């Protein structure tokens, strides 16, 4: 009798164990599929935000949206803030979170490959040049010519792609210039010094640090804002991602690779083989007539280059932006001044004037050995007012 009772007890305990394991696996599976559903809601929310932002109240304010009316688990929280010339979007669904850097599908209403304001001059195109997309130019049109003994050997612009430009470049949006102005007014004396290594999260607070005249072997992952009182040299051994840099003049050393947005009062220079990854940008505020951005050989910028204007001009032509033939910019180049561009621009080029500088002098209004083409996957910064459709920076 006692042995039967023992066996029955053991069988009962065994059945309880099996039921417990089954229930645990069921709960784990349910939890897994629930979290997968929440992640899917976050991805759907990004698509929704890219197409329509009217449900968002403003910046730095929490907004929620129920993706499927009547389904409480489909509610997603939105929080967005400006991050340089992009938007930082934080999404929450239950315990799941997603952080995205957002840009625009189009640079502005013009959707231009090349935009030159009306100056009463003809644009000369020479060498292996091509313009794929809309060309905005004054009423004098284009002429295909030669430089030295090199005749035009590129792709002619389709007549249907030539449009009439305005008297001036489209102006940057006031809210963007106001935001950048705030960057230059930071009182950095009260900030702590930057550590050599650090990692923050965009779901938290922005870290503000002051830096000296040179940074080396620094590894930071944003959101960080680093400010220097005057000139700054960034050595190529630094590894920076999601970082905003503010200084008077900035030079980035050979071989640097990272994702940074650099805002300078006077000038920015890139040495050789600098790679600025997606979500990067270079902005010079136009504080002097000698303002400039200069790219070195074999550089790549995935984001934007902006050189603001200044009413005081040098007596002789001066390149406010120089891009060598081995450099590539993917995104928007906006130069309120003279641009000396060679190489490739995948996206849009806006320039007050084009000049080709050579050893024997300079050629005004010359587009020579340049490729400017609209790329369907390009992400543009928030600079010029235009269509609201967003695209995630990847």
Task: Describe each model-derived feature in a short phrase.
Residues 270:
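A cross-family detector of function-defining hotspots
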Residues 79-212, 216-221, 225-228, 236-239, ...:
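Short, ordered "entry" segments at domain starts
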Residues 248-249, 260-261, 265-267, 277-394:
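Hydrophilic extracytoplasmic domains
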Residues 273:
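RNA-interacting cores
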Residues 1-118, 389-394:
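Beta-strand/loop motifs with alternating small/hydrophobic and polar/acidic residues, enriched
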Residues 25-26, 42, 46-49, 208-211, ...:
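Structured N-terminal alpha/beta-domain signature
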């Amino acid at each position: 009798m006692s042995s039967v009772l023992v066996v029955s007890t053991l069988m009962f305990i065994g059945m309880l164990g099996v039921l417990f394991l089954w229930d645990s696996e069921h709960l784990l599976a349910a939890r897994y599929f629930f979290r997968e559903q929440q992640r899917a809601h976050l991805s759907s929310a990004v698509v929704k935000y890219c197409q329509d932002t009217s449900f968002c109240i403003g910046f730095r304010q929490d907004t929620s949206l129920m993706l499927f009316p009547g389904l409480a688990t489909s509610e997603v929280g939105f929080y967005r803030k400006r991050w340089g010339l992009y938007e930082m979007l934080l999404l929450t669904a239950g315990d799941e979170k997603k952080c995205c850097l957002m840009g625009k599908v189009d640079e502005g209403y013009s959707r231009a490959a090349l935009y030159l304001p009306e100056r009463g001059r003809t644009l000369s195109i020479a060498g292996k040049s091509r313009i794929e997309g809309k060309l905005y130019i004054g009423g004098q049109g284009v002429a295909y010519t030669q430089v030295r003994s090199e005749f035009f050997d590129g792709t002619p612009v389709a007549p249907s792609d030539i449009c009439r430009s305005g008297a001036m470049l489209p102006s940057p949006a006031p809210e963007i210039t106001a935001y950048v102005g705030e960057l230059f007014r930071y009182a950095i004396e009260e900030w702590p010094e930057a550590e050599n290594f650090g990692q923050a999260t965009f779901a938290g607070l922005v870290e503000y640090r002051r830096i000296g005249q040179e940074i080396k072997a620094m590894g930071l992952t944003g959101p960080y804002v680093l400010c220097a009182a005057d000139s700054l040299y960034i050595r190529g051994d630094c590894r920076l991602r999601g970082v905003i840099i503010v200084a008077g003049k900035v030079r980035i050393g050979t071989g640097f690779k990272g994702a940074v947005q650099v805002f300078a009062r006077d000038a920015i220079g890139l040495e050789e083989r600098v790679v600025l990854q997606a979500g990067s940008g270079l902005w010079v505020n136009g504080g002097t007539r000698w303002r400039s951005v200069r790219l070195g050989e074999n550089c790549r910028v995935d984001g934007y280059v902006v050189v603001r204007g200044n009413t005081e001009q040098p007596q002789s032509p001066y390149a406010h932006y120089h891009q060598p033939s081995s450099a590539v910019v993917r995104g928007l180049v906006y130069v309120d001044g003279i641009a000396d561009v060679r190489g490739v621009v995948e996206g849009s080029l806006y320039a007050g004037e084009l000049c080709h500088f050579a050893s024997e002098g300079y050629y005004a209004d010359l587009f020579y050995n340049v490729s400017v083409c609209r790329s369907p996957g390009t992400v543009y910064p928030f600079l010029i007012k235009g269509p609201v459709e967003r695209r995630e920076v990847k």
